[in-house]
Amino acid sequence: MRMKRKKNLDERIEASSDYLITMKNDSLDFQDAIKENHLLDFKEIFKKEQPVYLEIGCGKGQFGNTFASLNPDKNILCVERNRNVLIMAIDKARELKLDNIMFLCGTAEYLPSYIPNNSIEEIYLNFSCPFPKKSHE
């Protein structure tokens, strides 16, 4: 079942810069895009310098927000391509006043141009969709 587009989605996404990073090269050809470097500086992004964990395909953010709540001594970067569900995850993080979680809007294949080598402690893949419907046909 397809989720209904959230009301004022564009405005809400724009107002979420305190929790959101948007991939710049998501529209480029994958092979060209991974050659570009947009490496994230985790010391700049997160308020505290502590280990960074990565969740790919965070959806509505239940795992990421719970992880951040239970582990204040760890940072988590949650990746999601669907802005419609990502805004729900951001809203929940804001409601919980979490300062150790950030969200990256984009697809996983572009991550090598954003994540510095040897900077992630662990990667979590919780029910991420391996084949989006249109590209799998």
Pin down the residues of each PLM region.
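Short beta-strand element of Class I
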Residues: 74-77
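Short alpha-helix immediately C-terminal to the canonical SAM-binding loop
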Residues: 86-88
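S-adenosyl-L-methionine
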Residues: 1-52, 62-69, 91-117
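Class I SAM-dependent methyltransferase "Motif I" SAM/SAH-binding loop
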Residues: 57-61
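Mobile active-site "lid"/loop adjacent to the S-adenosyl-L-methionine
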Residues: 121-137
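Conserved SAM/SAH-binding beta-strand->alpha-helix loop
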Residues: 82
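Conserved beta-strand/loop positions that form the S-adenosyl-L-methionine
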Residues: 56, 79
